[in-house]
Structures are given as C-alpha cells and as structure tokens.
C-alpha cells in the first residue's frame, strides 16, 4: 500500500477527480473498522510490554518507605518490618543424620565405550594372572650355574 504525506495529498487533491458514485459514509465506516482492529490488536499484546520503557519513560514502581518517628529529644528513628527471630543457641537442635545401610554389587566394566567391547588386556578382573614362583626361579638358575 502506498503511503503519502499530508503535503503530497494536498498536492494531489485538485488533480484527482472524485468519482460520481463515491460513497463517503462507506469509506469512513471502513476506516473506523480498521482503527478498531488496530486498537484491539494493541490491547491484546499490551501486557507483554508492562515493564518496558514504553515511550521512553521509566516504569513507576511503588516502594514502601520505612516509617520515621521523632521523639521528644529530636532523635528520628526508622521503623522497619520486624525481623524474623532465630532460636537461641541452647534451643537449637542439630539435625540427626540417618545413614541407611545398603549393599551394592559392583561389576567390572567390560566395555570401555558403549559401542565396542574392551580389549582383553584391559580387563584385569576376568583374566587370572599366573603366580610367580620365586623358588622355582631360583632352582632353575642354580642348575644352570652348576653345568
């Protein structure tokens, strides 16, 4: 849709002839209907911009001010909301920690990753190792020296 400024419309006004069957009331009704639709659309999404700086103005927040009391001597004190009081040290009870006795079975992880099995050298629990016999090694060394 082409948009014109007011100056351009005033320049085009005398040159453009008005049609003889032009209905001004119907034209004004269409304009009013479009305005209503635009207002409804703006109201629909107005709650999203509640705290934004709309029209470059800061939002106004209501802050509760503390009450100021002045005594006979001229001293002013601020009365704020009462603080939540804690129990004294003697009244405090330490929370008791209960540890449940559980038995867990641990299986050796045979898979390094989920897609392929581990190498046989990596699995120590399944492969029995040969015990080293020191006496057998000493006997074999002595026999070689005697020859």
Curated annotation (Swiss-Prot):
Bias type Basic residues, positions: 48-66
Subcellular localization(s) per the UniProt record: Cytoplasm
GO cellular component, one term: cytoplasm
Keywords: Cytoplasm, Initiation factor, Phosphoprotein, Protein biosynthesis, Protein synthesis inhibitor, Translation regulation
Chain positions covered by the region annotation Disordered: 41-76
GO biological process: negative regulation of translation
Taxonomic superkingdom: Eukaryota
Example GO molecular function: translation initiation factor activity
Pfam family, one: CAF20
Record InterPro entries: Caf20 (IPR031456)
Family of the protein in this entry: Belongs to the CAF20 family.
Role summary: Acts as an inhibitor of cap-dependent translation. Competes with eIF4G1 and EAP1 for binding to eIF4E and interferes with the formation of the eIF4F complex, inhibiting translation and stabilizing mRNA.
Protein name: Cap-associated protein CAF20
Lineage of the organism: Eukaryota, Fungi, Dikarya, Ascomycota, Saccharomycotina
């Amino acid at each position: 849709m082409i948009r014109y400024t007011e100056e351009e419309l005033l320049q085009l006004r005398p040159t453009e002839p008005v049609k003889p069957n032009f209905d001004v009331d119907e034209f004004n009704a269409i304009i009013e209907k479009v305005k209503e639709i635009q207002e409804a659309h703006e109201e629909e999404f107005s709650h999203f911009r509640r705290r934004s700086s709309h029209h470059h103005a800061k939002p106004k927040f209501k802050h509760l001010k503390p009450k100021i009391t002045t005594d006979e001597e001229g001293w002013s004190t601020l009365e704020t909301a009462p603080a939540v009081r804690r129990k004294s040290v003697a009244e405090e009870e330490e929370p008791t920690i209960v540890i449940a006795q559980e038995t867990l079975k641990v299986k050796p992880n045979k898979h390094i990753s989920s897609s392929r099995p581990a190498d046989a050298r990596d699995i120590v629990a399944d492969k029995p190792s040969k015990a080293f016999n020191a006496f057998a090694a000493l006997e074999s060394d002595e026999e070689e020296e005697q020859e």
